[in-house]
Curated annotation (Swiss-Prot):
It comes from Cenarchaeum symbiosum (strain A). One of its GO terms (molecular function) is ATP binding. Its EC number is 6.1.1.11. Pathway: Aminoacyl-tRNA biosynthesis; selenocysteinyl-tRNA(Sec) biosynthesis; L-seryl-tRNA(Sec) from L-serine and tRNA(Sec): step 1/1. It is found in: Cytoplasm. The gene is serS. This is Serine--tRNA ligase. It comes from the Archaea. Its main location: cytoplasm. NCBIfam families: serS. ATP binds at R258, K259, E260, V274, E345, V346, V347, S348.
Length: 418
């Protein structure tokens, strides 16, 4: 949710943001609702004071033996007008909130403007391990080796599900264990969140229309399967005042469940885009003045992780038309998929400023005598394991079908190759 002060004082900037994001939004209706709710709020306050004064006057008249007929009528008239003003205020407030909860976040000045991914900017590349000259696709190789079964998973659960088998299970668990050790050694608190989340918590972390077709709802219950631990961690401190101690750096580990409703025809083979996967997510609650440093820090840590694995990647700054609505700035890390001869997105690293914290009411203060402020929230993937498994299989395969295990994972897998 945007700071109301920004809406009132910088409507041109807000309009420019909507245009840059290609979002169809009735800004005039939001501003009108805001003006009406504030007008009727003030009117109701004034009438409340007048009614209270009239009530005291009636009481005084009774004590003095003065006729109270006119004063009582005036008090009743004021009560009726107050009731009408409060109704108008509530109506305008509802209209305002309905719109305010759907407007996207402001965009940082450093974000390139453009309609879609064609305006994204590649910032740098890291070469990593030499890739095979004639690689097999990860599904072909893993299925052929008996490490992956897509056919039986489709029979049991439908498309975009899979069975991991044998050493690929150990490699998946190795990615989880290494990720947690990696972040834990860098000051992150490990968190295993609930895998189900209420709608109000979900709406605090993400705009409703962006998750309705993405995540699974539990029928006849106010619960959703999480699409990422980010949402559960964002809501963890909802309706709280954090007393000092910022930043809070969390490393969330969880399965993730996604409908992938908009992915028809994309990545139909393999495990790059699936309905269920494990993910380790970074989430930070920061002071406003520190959030951009925290954003850079998260990206640096994530790059260090991929360099340690030896996976080739590039860092991409997303354009205004390609980034998520809650983010003010997003970097993607795209890893090289040797068999696809292409870079594919595996990491999204975003600064959401105070957009989520206003929705979730997460504030902080350093001293008890200070006013509270909204925290800034940041998030970044560290490892979505199904995508990393695909990257490792395609980039670390030998001609005989052997898959080399990246050095940091060998102690968890117990071997150098599978």
């Amino acid at each position: 949710m945007l700071d109301p002060h920004i809406l009132r004082s910088r409507p041109k900037d807000v309009s420019d943001m909507l245009q840059a994001r290609n979002v169809d939004f009735d800004l005039d209706a939001l501003l009108d609702a805001d003006e009406r709710r504030r007008y009727f709020m003030q009117l109701a306050d004034d009438m409340r004071q007048e009614r209270n004064f009239a009530g005291r006057q009636v009481a005084q008249f009774k004590r003095d033996g003065v006729d109270t007929t006119a004063a009582i009528k005036e008090m009743k008239d004021l009560s009726e007008k107050l009731y009408q003003a409060e109704g108008e205020q509530q109506s305008a407030e509802s209209e305002y909130l309905e719109l305010a909860w759907t407007i996207p976040n402001m965009i940082d000045k450093s974000v390139p403007r453009g309609p879609d991914e064609t305006a994204n900017v590649v910032l740098r590349k890291w070469v990593g391990t030499p890739t095979p000259s004639v690689p097999k696709g990860h599904e072909e190789l893993a299925v052929g080796r008996g490490l992956l079964d897509m056919k039986r998973a489709a029979k049991v659960s439908g498309a975009r599900f899979y069975y991991l088998k044998g050493s690929l299970v150990r490699l998946n668990q190795a990615l989880i264990s290494h990720s947690l050790d990696f972040l834990g050694s860098r000051g992150y608190t490990l968190v295993q969140p609930p895998y189900l989340i209420r709608r109000n918590a979900m709406e605090g972390a993400i705009i409703a229309e962006d998750f309705e077709d993405v995540i699974y709802k539990i029928e006849d219950d106010d619960l959703y399967l999480i699409g990422t631990s980010e949402h559960a961690m964002a809501a963890m401190h909802s309706d709280e005042i954090i007393e000092g101690g910022l930043p809070l750096r969390y490393a969330g580990v969880s399965p993730c469940f996604r409908k992938e409703a908009g992915a028809h025809g994309k990545d139909q083979k393999g495990i790059f885009r699936v309905h269920q996967f494990d993910k380790i997510e970074q989430f930070v609650f920061s002071k406003p003045e520190d959030s951009w440093r925290e954003h850079d820090r998260m990206l640096e840590i994530t790059e260090e992780f991929y360099q340690g694995l030896g996976i080739p990647y590039r860092v991409v700054l997303l354009s205004s038309g390609d980034m998520g609505k809650v983010s003010a700035k997003t970097y993607d890390i795209e890893c090289w998929m040797a068999a696809q001869d292409a870079y594919r997105e595996v990491v999204s690293c975003s600064n959401c400023l105070d957009f989520q914290s206003r929705r979730l009411k997460v504030r902080f203060r350093d001293r008890t005598d200070e006013d509270t402020q909204y925290v800034h929230t940041l998030n970044s993937t560290l490892a979505a394991t199904s995508r990393l498994l695909a990257c490792i299989i395609e980039n670390f395969q030998e001609a005989d079908g052997t898959i080399r295990v990246p050095q940091p994972l060998q102690k968890y897998v117990g071997k150098e190759a599978i």
